[in-house]
């Protein structure tokens, strides 16, 4: 079957992508590493010994950067519906975050451990229909917020990929009630055509 023009265009963009090539040269698992690196360098997300949850972790770039920044005493709990090649310092759970049993598996792995940072690079499979895509994306965001409500320690932080659209303003309002400040970030490594931004909610209120 011939590839569609859109999929062929995506492949060309992918292989011509500066950050894809840079990730290969630098030994990182994905171009997404540079989004997190830029946010980290601006906002100092990490410190040694932190406990971090990485949602939408595959193929593992964000977890790689996190273990690099948190050191041998840090712990990363990563989750994705796709497999991730294991590496030191990361506990990986494969499954759909929307499923109750997978969510519970993550809580079981934490074993009561309080979390310093919840981060999510999750996104649904996009159809191109905003009326479908935005609600699906917002549902994942809401699940991530619920998890942070449950496991983040006081003054903990939440970093999430979001897509602006219906429900975005209400999300901001809700986060501002729960956290000391909420920042928006658009890393240079985000593809220009992408509507994604990242919300960084800092300092969970007790």
UniProtKB/Swiss-Prot annotation:
The active site is at residue 161. It holds the Pfam family FtsJ. Its EC number is 2.1.1.166. Gene3D superfamilies: Vaccinia Virus protein VP39 (3.40.50.150). Keywords: Cytoplasm, Methyltransferase, rRNA processing, S-adenosyl-L-methionine, Transferase. The keyword Transferase applies. It is found in: Cytoplasm. Its main location: cytoplasm. It catalyses: uridine(2552) in 23S rRNA + S-adenosyl-L-methionine = 2'-O-methyluridine(2552) in 23S rRNA + S-adenosyl-L-homocysteine + H(+). Coiled coil: none annotated. It is an enzyme of class 2 (transferase). InterPro entries: RNA_methyltr_RlmE, RNA_MeTrfase_FtsJ_dom, rRNA-MeTfrase_E, SAM-dependent_MTases_sf. GO terms for cellular component: cytoplasm. S-adenosyl-L-methionine binds at residues 60, 62, 80, 96, 121. GO terms for molecular function: rRNA (uridine-2'-O-)-methyltransferase activity. HAMAP family: RNA_methyltr_E. Belongs to the class I-like SAM-binding methyltransferase superfamily. RNA methyltransferase RlmE family. PANTHER family: RIBOSOMAL RNA METHYLTRANSFERASE (PTHR10920), RRNA METHYLTRANSFERASE 2, MITOCHONDRIAL (PTHR10920:SF18). This is Ribosomal RNA large subunit methyltransferase E. It comes from Hydrogenovibrio crunogenus (strain DSM 25203 / XCL-2) (Thiomicrospira crunogena). The lineage of its organism: Bacteria, Pseudomonadati, Pseudomonadota, Gammaproteobacteria, Thiotrichales. The gene is rlmE.
